[in-house]
Amino acid sequence: MSRVCQLSGKRANNGMAVSHSHVRTKKLQQVNLQQRRLWWAEGNRWVKLRVSTSALRTIQKKGLGAYAKELGINLAKI
């Protein structure tokens, strides 16, 4: 399974690691993904999702159903 957030679509970022001598090497900055079982009130059931921690904060603020609707994701298919 690829390291992509199922809700926000966040994925790894290509960056550079810069040493003290300013030697640059390529570095992959991974997304902080968590496997979570979230309660979906509208569907009256649990939904298992692999989401980023920033998406979890947004879910706490807006609610799972509202956030998924905003992103155009159908939770019934998950």
Swiss-Prot record:
Any one Pfam family match given in the protein's UniProt record, by short name: Ribosomal_L28
GO BP annotations, alphabetical order: translation
Ribosomal protein as UniProt keyword: yes
Alphabetical keyword list: Ribonucleoprotein, Ribosomal protein
Region (Disordered): 1-21
InterPro entries: Ribosomal_bL28, Ribosomal_bL28/bL31-like_sf, Ribosomal_bL28_bact-type, Ribosomal_bL28_sf
GO MF annotations, alphabetized: structural constituent of ribosome
One GO CC term on file: ribosome
Homology family: Belongs to the bacterial ribosomal protein bL28 family.
NCBIfam families recorded: L28
PANTHER family, per the entry: 39S RIBOSOMAL PROTEIN L28, MITOCHONDRIAL, LARGE RIBOSOMAL SUBUNIT PROTEIN BL28M
Protein's name according to its UniProt entry: Large ribosomal subunit protein bL28
